């Protein structure tokens, strides 16, 4: 049985997010994407940083996460970017079936 997950990725540029979304969907690596504008605060080289960011959430099969990471790396401007894989442990069978039917992952 396939394992499913949501991946959270933070960006600082909306156009970068849009290019990434288009590529992920075109390659059939994700079934859906949501973008949320947020204010983030973090430590970077022992200094506190605060900035507007865009959080991208994608739904996919866990076995495609490496391909997704490699594709995001092509579009992402951050030296070190958030790529948090969150298992989907409880949802409807119909939702998982929808992800399964939409996500295929083209070969690179």
Task: Annotate each language-model stretch with its function.
Residues 1-108:
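Positively charged, small/polar-rich N-terminal and surface patches that mediate targeting and assembly
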């Amino acid at each position: 049985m396939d394992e499913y997950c949501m991946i959270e990725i933070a960006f600082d540029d909306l156009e970068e997010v849009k290019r990434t979304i288009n590529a992920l969907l075109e390659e059939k690596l994700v079934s859906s994407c949501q973008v949320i504008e947020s204010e983030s605060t973090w430590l970077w080289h022992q200094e506190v940083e605060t900035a507007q960011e865009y959080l991208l959430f994608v739904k996919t099969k866990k076995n495609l996460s490496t391909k997704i990471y490699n594709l995001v790396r092509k579009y992402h401007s951050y030296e070190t970017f958030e790529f948090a894989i969150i298992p989907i442990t409880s949802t409807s069978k119909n939702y998982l079936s929808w992800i399964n039917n939409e996500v295929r992952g083209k070969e690179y």
